[in-house]
């Protein structure tokens, strides 16, 4: 009997201790969430530092291809255009060519993200029925024309964008404490040369514009290592190893590494990132959208990345005065592959507009 009562007391004590631990855990969790919210609100108060480039969403929707606006499949995803520009003069809008073009497709239900680089030299309709290398769209009409270019050529419904200057990427990665990248031996010399070009060092051939307040630290060995902001940004820009296709892959690799570090970060570091990044960012997203995305950062996972045109359906060649271009072979086939990759549409039928643009690209390039 005494043994039974002692067992009951031990069980009750264990239960009370468990409840106490759960209560403490709940308090710690609530404190952390509150702290995170405070930091997010603090960051939102700084959104006047973000460059707001006005875009006409209704005009963008008016230029979308047949059946895109009402697509049931596309409504299950949030598609955002990401642009990276080399603008140390502070210009993030029209007049600056986009060195980086990435479609980020977020599954609304799962939080899974798939990234697709659009190779900047791809020969496409620029969104105004003229044809050239696709990165010219941003230079000619800023983010709005670049979004139209993506939507029209690829049957997409993008209405939002984020543009980051390379200096913003440098500062963001430094605020995170660096990112881990596996650097190959044949990439080191080019990585260091791009660093030199961005910090204002002088070489025998050329004097470069300085990136203020950034020091050059040479990468000396291959292998997995932590790169600082300048090193990682220089890594993104390498195009002499694997050409522009590998360059785009490196950009996606760095973006994924940044995402991994952000998911592990604490509120104080998040504050540093906001301070560093916001002055070098232009976006169409409003305060509530940015707050919601920051609040869901732990939900997001990058589950796939690729490049457009796809490896099996592209070639390179000279297209008259446009010079050397990446040529989709053929555009309509690549768009079908894109919808399979981003949205799991196995038998996607491209729009009549994409068929028309595909014929024009083939006619101009002879492919």
Say what each PLM segment does:
Residues 174-269:
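Flexible, polar/acidic helix-loop-strand segments at domain edges
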Residues 3-111, 292-295:
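Entry/capping segment at the start of metal-dependent catalytic domains
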Residues 73-79, 85, 93-97, 127, ...:
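Solvent-exposed, acidic/flexible segments
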Residues 75-78, 96-101, 110-118, 129, ...:
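Extracytoplasmic
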Residues 140-204, 210, 284-286, 290:
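Amphipathic, coiled-coil-like alpha-helical scaffolding segments used for oligomerization/assembly
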Residues 64-70, 77, 126, 280-367:
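C-terminal solvent-exposed extensions
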Residues 89-92, 132-140, 155-160, 222, ...:
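Second-shell loop/turn segments in exported
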Residues 98-100, 131, 143-151, 166-170, ...:
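Extracytoplasmic/secreted envelope proteins and their assembly/folding machinery
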């Amino acid at each position: 009997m005494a043994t039974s009562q002692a067992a009951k007391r031990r069980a009750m004590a264990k239960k009370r201790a468990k409840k106490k631990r759960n209560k403490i855990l709940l308090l710690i969790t609530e404190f952390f969430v509150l702290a995170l919210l405070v930091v997010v609100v603090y960051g939102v108060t700084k959104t006047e530092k973000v460059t707001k480039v006005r875009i006409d969403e209704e005009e963008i929707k008016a230029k979308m291809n047949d059946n895109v606006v009402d697509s049931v499949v596309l409504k299950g995803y949030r598609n955002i255009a990401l642009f990276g520009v080399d603008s140390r003069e502070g210009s993030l809008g029209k007049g600056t060519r986009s060195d980086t073009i990435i479609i980020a497709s977020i599954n609304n239900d799962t939080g899974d993200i798939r990234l697709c680089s659009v190779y900047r030299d791809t020969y496409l309709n620029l969104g105004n029925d003229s044809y050239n290398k696709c990165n010219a769209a941003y230079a000619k009409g800023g983010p709005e024309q670049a979004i139209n270019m993506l939507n029209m050529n690829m049957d997409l419904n993008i209405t939002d964008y984020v543009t980051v200057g390379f200096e913003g990427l440098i500062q963001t990665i430094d605020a995170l404490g660096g990112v881990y990248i596996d650097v190959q031996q044949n990439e080191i010399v080019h990585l260091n040369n791009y660093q030199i070009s961005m910090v204002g060092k002088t070489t025998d051939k050329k004097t470069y514009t300085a990136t203020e307040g950034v020091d050059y630290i040479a990468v000396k060995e291959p292998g997995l290592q932590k790169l600082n902001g300048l090193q990682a940004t220089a890594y993104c820009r390498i195009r002499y190893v694997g050409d522009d296709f590998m360059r785009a892959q490196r950009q996606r690799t760095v973006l994924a590494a940044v995402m991994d570090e952000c998911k592990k970060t604490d509120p104080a570091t998040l504050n540093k990132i906001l301070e560093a990044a916001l002055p070098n960012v232009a976006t169409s997203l409003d305060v509530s959208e940015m707050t919601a995305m920051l609040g869901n950062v732990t939900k997001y996972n990058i589950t796939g990345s690729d490049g457009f045109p796809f490896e099996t359906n592209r070639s390179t060649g000279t297209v008259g005065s446009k010079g050397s271009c990446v040529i989709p072979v053929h555009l309509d086939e690549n768009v079908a592959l894109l919808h399979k990759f981003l949205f799991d549409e196995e038998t996607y039928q491209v729009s009549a507009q994409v068929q028309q643009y595909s014929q024009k690209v083939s006619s101009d390039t002879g492919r």
